[in-house]
Amino acid sequence: MNQRLAAAAYAAALLGSGAAASAASIGKSRLRPPLPRVEAAPIVPLHPPRVSSEPITFVWPPEGMVLSAEEEFVFGSVADPDAHFAINGQTVAVHKDGGFLAWLPISAGTFTFRAELALSSGTAVAERRLFVPPPPVPLPDDKLAIDPASLSPKADLELRAGDWWTARMKATRGKPARVRVPGGPWRDMREVNPRLGIYEAVFQVAPREEFGPAPLQYQIGSGGSAPRATGTARVSATVMPPSVATAKANAAGFLNVKTAPSGGFMVFPPAGARMLADGRDGDSVRVELGPGLSGWLDAKDVELSTSSLPPRAEIGNVGVTETPAGASVRISLSERVPFEVVENDAQDAAVVRIFSATGHTNIVAFEGGSDFVDQVRWRQEATGVVAVTVRLKPGRRLWGWNARYDGGASLRLDLRRPPRVNRRRPLEGLKVMLDPGHMPSAPGAVGPLGTKEMDANYAIAEAAAELLRREGALPLLTRGTTTDEVSLVDRPRQAVDRGADMFISLHNNGLPDGTNPFSKPRGFTVFYYHPHSLALGRAVHDAYAKAALVPDEGLQWDNLLVARLSAVPSILVENAYMILPEQEALLNEPAFREKLAVALVAGLKNFALEAGDTEKKP
């Protein structure tokens, strides 16, 4: 899934924060329960990869790719797997099906992979070219100069008192260097990389300091004739009040507040949420969440206003009602502001943390009572931050939760209890959503023979769906056919809209460029995000490990968008590696896909027995 394909930028791994389970137990030895018996599904053939008529076919890297690395993997196929095959004079092993994968050195400039296949009719030759940028070198020492392309910051900055910022340039080595905002004093720069001549100066905006917006001026050397350069970014500091940013509506229904302009995601405000905006870095706007806590949003995703009143939500009364699935907690607010939900590791409590808010809750009403929620408490955690804690009754635990603004400014937290499970048939009656990753417009990774990940994912999902039907479950597929186009954000949304009880996203792996595919054993990985999904991830991981079909790369926490689905236990499974010839060959075998499906369903059964309400049906 991680392989970078020129035609497919499929954002399956968005980073962020939220209810992260402790990963301390991952990797420790533990007894695995016996796998439940699962009847085999009918074998469904995978659409075979296209067979090239050429003696040698390169699949990766693409022609003309630009790559900054010292080594790169190369894969494709040959017409005769028994013939001697070499790339740049190095013998390359070929799988019996004709696929090959090599890890080879590359050098700067236009680099050519020259492949030779010794056929009985003569030697077949094929070439694949890429460009490797040369390593950075210093400027000549015999002349004072500044590299204008190196001047940083490269994007406009809007700063406030207390903000730290950095000016940087590349210039002749070992010389005095200075920088200034036009009209301001010159400030010395320090040479932080003497080998390349990289200079930096770090600043903090002083209280009441104002300047700009204007580009920085840089100088190398001393005296009036010393070379100078002017940056392209405009930098400013202001004492004006912050703007108000209002989240725009989008396809996902939420925005991603990041830890830095290019950092990981941390909070996900819904459309209409208002925040103070008190800084800017290029196309990113800094928003204030609470005392000492800020994040960054894409400027295009918010409406900015300098005339609106700042967000100050008041938290009113709280109501708790029983629902068929569990309970619903409604928190009255005077306006929409950002919030986050954090569940504890024991899965018996959740905290709704509301930003830009003041608590004024006099009543917590249990309407008709609740056998699921025990108590609701609130406190002013910090100035502008209210924490509402929902604790379940003893012995109860979360199966999932969903938080949203209901209509206007009322915040609704739906809590889901575990479904009833029949010990003899633990999956009977459960809706299991299978998400075959990728689609025709974003096909994912590709194998040496040309097998597309999206097709392998779908074939595994079909095999698992048939097994689930035999177990009495109702399988739901996010992609109903191999040609369906389903966006990434629509996949977890389907789980909510179609009433799924579990969500499993099925993938097969690739590797980022410059990563040695032979550096360690590679095989399956299971990913989870929320604490209430850890048990599902562990059960499926253990079932795959017991089946021992490919090497085990572990159970991992990861901030993947589909795994962040909170309404039900949700995981993502990387079944095998598309780019490894032997694993691509296995994925093209119906019997192997059947074994994967058997392991998956066995893990789901064990999870249902462990986490579900296992009272016997009448």
Where are these predicted regions, by residue range?
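Active-site-adjacent substrate-binding region
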Residues: 531-556, 566
